[in-house]
């Protein structure tokens, strides 16, 4: 089942980025990115907005997986 965690991993890998590179680009810690990707934490709304803008995807896609 695809989740926000798996979508973050897929988007990051498709962009050819390491967790550290993504964290640096978004001014976040690598640990935060790691926790999101493993599903141990869910990104807050500000981080979700940052991720959607960074990867140029809709909030619907990032949160729910729909391409609306």
Regions found by a protein language model. Give the residues of each.
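Hydrophobic side chains within well-formed alpha-helices
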Residues: 4, 8, 29, 58-59
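Short amphipathic helical patch at the helix-1/turn junction of helix-turn-helix
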Residues: 2, 13-14, 42, 53
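Conserved hydrophobic/aromatic packing and binding residues within compact polymer-binding modules
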Residues: 8, 22-23, 33-36, 62
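Recognition helix of helix-turn-helix/homeodomain-like DNA-binding domains
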Residues: 28-43, 64
């Amino acid at each position: 089942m695809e989740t926000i965690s798996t979508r973050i991993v897929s988007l990051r890998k498709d962009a050819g980025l390491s967790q550290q590179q993504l964290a640096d680009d978004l001014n976040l810690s690598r640990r935060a990115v790691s926790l999101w990707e493993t599903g141990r934490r869910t990104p807050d709304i500000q981080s979700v907005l940052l991720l959607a803008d960074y990867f140029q995807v809709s909030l619907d896609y990032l949160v729910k997986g729909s391409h609306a």
